Amino acid sequence: YEHLFDGLVNPVHVLYHWLGQFSGAKSVITAREPDGKKYGPAIFRCHMPNWGYPPHIDSVRNTGSTLHASADQRTQYAVHRFEHQLGGVLLLQAPEEGSASCDSILYRCEWNNEVEDMMETVYLGLDEPEANMISADKFEHYVQANSISTYEVKLLPGDLYFFRAECPHVIPKFLGKRPRITMATFFGYTQSDPEIFVWS
């Protein structure tokens, strides 16, 4: 991994640089556990055609997280301490033009007991056989009934966006033959904490 971008602009370094520019006096570092174990600085994902993620959240602090760890186990993670958690996605390769309606759908919806009651185990296929997700049908009904606004994220290669990890979002399926390739990461901060942790 250390030599993957030799001779090129390293997108991981660019991400950390800009987080540092926006963070004021806070230190931006790769997350680590008290015993010294480090998290990954970012992850590269290859989303294949005809595959996507149903509604889900990514905040480690929340019971609706796609993590398989129990709520009790999650409180033991060093990244759990951060009140605010965000995800960041950089598009490296887009599917064929016209094969995808959008790259992501974001919902202006806070996690709550009603949404938590919609959680179910979903079969995803590929290397992630199953995960905790929000029931797509139930959530769509909830969104309509409560007039929850949505935003469709449409990216070009090189575009980077951030989203609140505690709000539901969807990665829609797309057609074609070319995979969508992204670099993704999460970061957390608390106003009073001098550090911003970045992890994948």
Language model segments and positions:
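Short, internal active-site loops enriched in acidic
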Residues: 49-50, 168
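Catalytic core of Fe(II)/2-oxoglutarate
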Residues: 116-200
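Residue-level detector of short, conserved catalytic/binding motifs and their immediate flanks
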Residues: 42, 84-86, 90, 159, ...
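Short edge beta-strand segments in beta-sheet-rich domains
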Residues: 39, 99-101, 178-182
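Short His-Asn-centered micro-motif
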Residues: 47, 88, 164-165
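Signature of the catalytic double-stranded beta-helix
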Residues: 1-49, 73, 77-80
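Catalytic core of non-heme Fe(II) oxygenases with the double-stranded beta-helix
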Residues: 50-150
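A structural signal for well-ordered alpha-helical segments within the folded catalytic domains
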Residues: 9-13, 86, 156
